[in-house]
Amino acid sequence: MFGTMIEIENALPKDIATINVKFIKKIINEVCKGYVTKIVWRDNKYIPPVEEHLKVTLITCFYWAINCIALVVFEENVTKEVLEWMSTFPPIVKDSCIVSRLMDDIVAHEFETERNNVATAVTCHMKEYGTTKEEASEVLWDVVENAWKDMNKEYLNRTDIPASLLVRVINLARMMETMYNEIDGYTDSAILKNRISLLLEKPISF
């Protein structure tokens, strides 16, 4: 992971490389702390309340880090203010992570449970509220829908952050929704073949 940081630093202009990579490393450190917490949960078979679960897994899903890396690598003339904004785990990024994390947990719940991984948000909801898997999934789908509404509102109303950056955050959520829409396309990537083929072979013209 930090080897990748070195590659990014070497690829960036020297006048911004150190500052920008330091910014990314700070976020990666938070991700690694979350990984340690998840290992403890798994080894102790701990099923946290939903809020505690999301406080960690919204970070470890790595989408905040991906947005940070994309900002530094692909966005030109990134200001200090924008970097500081991104470092706060802003609402639109958090909502993007909610979409990604919860959709993954819903569609991959059985697979993750069978391999004794960290409890999914579905399992956490079932334990905390005494719900069935179906009831928990329905509640979490509503959370995903609300996250989409909040992301769209933030995109339309935010004027101090470049629209190109905001839409990149939303596009990541769109990609994850495609990957986890009723299927676990990450675990079984072959099922995404037709969708990828359509994108590459029959793209929609604008």
Model regions and ranges:
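Alpha-helical, largely C-terminal catalytic domains
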Residues: M1-F206
